Amino acid sequence: MANIKSAIKRAELNKVANERNAQQKSAMRTLIKKFEAAPTEELYRAASSSIDKAASKGLIHANKASRDKARLAAKLG
């Protein structure tokens, strides 16, 4: 456990950020699974948007976002 006050604060902030990131990644994965279960244009847009948001926030790498979107598009068409 950290002894320095700033390190204690950073540890708490890291914990909060980790929980938030996990929720956002989970939501993204859920949308992808919904699309894969029933590929529709509406679900594709939702999943694609979620992937873009995750990439812009640094949750996933930009190349992974591009790859995931391409795979979803292939399943759509």
UniProtKB/Swiss-Prot annotation:
Keyword Nucleus applies: no
Cross-referenced Gene3D superfamilies: Ribosomal protein S20 (1.20.58.110)
GO cellular component: cytosol; small ribosomal subunit
Record key words, sorted: Ribonucleoprotein, Ribosomal protein, RNA-binding, rRNA-binding
Protein known as: Small ribosomal subunit protein bS20
GO terms, molecular function: small ribosomal subunit rRNA binding; structural constituent of ribosome
Similarity-based family: Belongs to the bacterial ribosomal protein bS20 family.
Gene responsible for this protein: rpsT
A GO biological process held by the record: translation
Top-rank taxon, per record: Bacteria
Cysteine disulfide links: none
Role played: Binds directly to 16S ribosomal RNA.
InterPro entries, per database record: Ribosomal_bS20, Ribosomal_bS20_sf
